[in-house]
C-alpha cells in the first residue's frame, strides 16, 4: 500500500507536494494510541496547520469514534461534552463502514528535513491487509489445533 501524502501547511512556500515523501514515521504510531487526527477536536491550535475548522475536527473525531473500540477517559475534552478521545481502531469497522481515519503528522522532504505538517487519510488497503493477515493466522492456528 502506498503511503498517502500529508495535506496541510508547507514550512516554505517554494515546496510542493512533489517534494514530499509519503506519510511515515512515529506519528503513525501515536494514531494507534488515539492521539493526532483521532482526537482532532482536542487540538484546536493544530487546525490551522491542517487547513481545517472546528466543525471538521469534530466530524473527524466522531468518525474516528465510529471505527474505534472505545474512548480514553483520562483526558476528557471540555468543549466536546467531556468525552474522551477515540482509541483502538477496529479494522473490521473501518472496512465495513468505509470510514477512513484521518492521521496528523509532519511532512518529510525527499531530500531530507521537514517540509510541513498536516493530515492524511489512511488507505483502506492497510486495514484490508490487516484483516487478511489475521484471517490467515486464525486459519493456520485452527488447522494446527485440529
Spell out what each predicted region is.
Residues 1-146:
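Anaerobic metallocofactor- and corrinoid-dependent redox/one-carbon enzyme cores
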Amino acid at each position: 500500500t502506498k503511503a498517502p501524502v500529508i495535506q496541510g501547511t508547507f514550512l516554505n512556500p517554494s515546496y510542493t507536494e512533489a517534494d514530499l515523501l509519503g506519510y511515515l514515521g512515529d506519528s503513525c504510531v501515536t494514531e494507534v494510541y488515539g492521539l493526532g487526527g483521532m482526537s482532532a477536536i482536542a487540538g484546536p491550535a493544530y487546525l490551522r496547520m491542517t487547513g481545517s475548522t472546528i466543525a471538521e475536527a469534530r466530524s473527524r473525531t466522531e468518525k474516528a469514534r465510529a471505527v474505534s473500540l472505545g474512548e480514553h477517559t483520562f483526558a476528557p475534552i471540555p468543549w466536546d461534552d467531556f468525552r474522551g478521545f477515540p482509541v483502538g481502531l477496529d479494522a473490521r469497522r473501518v472496512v465495513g463502514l468505509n470510514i477512513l481515519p484521518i492521521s496528523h503528522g509532519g511532512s518529510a522532504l525527499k531530500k531530507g528535513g521537514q517540509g510541513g505538517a498536516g493530515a492524511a487519510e489512511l488507505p483502506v488497503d492497510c486495514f484490508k491487509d490487516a484483516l487478511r493477515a489475521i484471517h490467515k493466522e486464525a486459519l493456520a492456528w485452527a488447522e494446527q489445533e485440529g
